[in-house]
Regions:
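A glycine-rich, Thr/Ser-enriched phosphate-binding loop motif common to dinucleotide/cofactor-binding enzymes
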Residues: 32-33, 40-49, 66-87, 100-108
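Short helix-loop-beta connector
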Residues: 65-68, 90-96, 158-159
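Glycine-centered, small-residue-biased loops immediately flanking beta-strands
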Residues: 95, 185-186
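Adenosine-nucleotide cofactor-binding segment
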Residues: 99-102, 112-176
Length: 189
């Protein structure tokens, strides 16, 4: 569910991700019924349904010529990764960014960091093919996890990166993100 647009977090336009309705209402408020019995959606989203009913705030009209398999990528992975760089972390021009994970969300985060004007973008992944993709998408450096400390020393003089974006969802890379940023840096988990 999208943010409600009415609570204090939504109204100030700075923290719609903290919307209480979004966090709790989408999972607990039944939107459908069969007879008198409430019907809940899987995780509040109807993920495995062939059709679902959505509030207008959750819908974006697309050109009918855009294939749905392409449009669906933009609506999830691309917006999550690029949004982490542009909207959540607010990467600044000339900054240094380390991105853990070079899958779909990670390469979108790389693109977001590029758009924001980051000078140094380090992608971290275990998979060589994904590191190659990261370079193609704009990473200035692509390293394996064991090479992060060397990249940190080379790029930041050991002080740490301005931003770390964790795009895997693994507790180890979450911790590594905090360790990778400089004092006062931003880790986006």
């Amino acid at each position: 569910s999208p943010p409600c647009g009415e609570c204090k977090f939504c109204v100030d336009h700075t923290s719609p991700n903290l919307c209480v309705t979004l966090q709790f209402g989408s999972m607990t408020i039944p939107h459908f019924s069969e007879g008198n019995a409430p019907v809940h959606a899987m995780a509040g989203t109807g993920t495995f349904a062939e059709k679902t009913l959505l509030p207008k705030q959750a819908v974006v009209k697309i050109d009918p010529d855009i294939p749905l398999d392409i449009a669906s990528l933009i609506g999830c992975g691309v917006m999550t990764g690029a949004g982490a760089a542009l909207n959540t972390a607010k990467v600044t021009p000339g900054s240094s960014v380390i991105i853990y994970g070079a899958g779909g969300v990670g390469v979108a985060a790389i693109q977001g960091a590029r758009i924001a004007g980051a000078a140094e973008i380090v992608a971290v992944d275990l998979n060589d093919a994904k590191l190659d993709d990261a370079r193609r998408f704009g990473a200035t450096h692509a390293v394996k996890p064991e090479d992060v400390d060397g990249a940190k020393l080379e790029i930041t003089g050991g002080d740490g990166f301005d931003y770390a974006l964790e795009c895997i969802g693994n507790p180890l890379t979450m911790r590594a993100s905090f360790d990778a940023v400089r004092r006062g840096g931003t880790a986006c988990i």
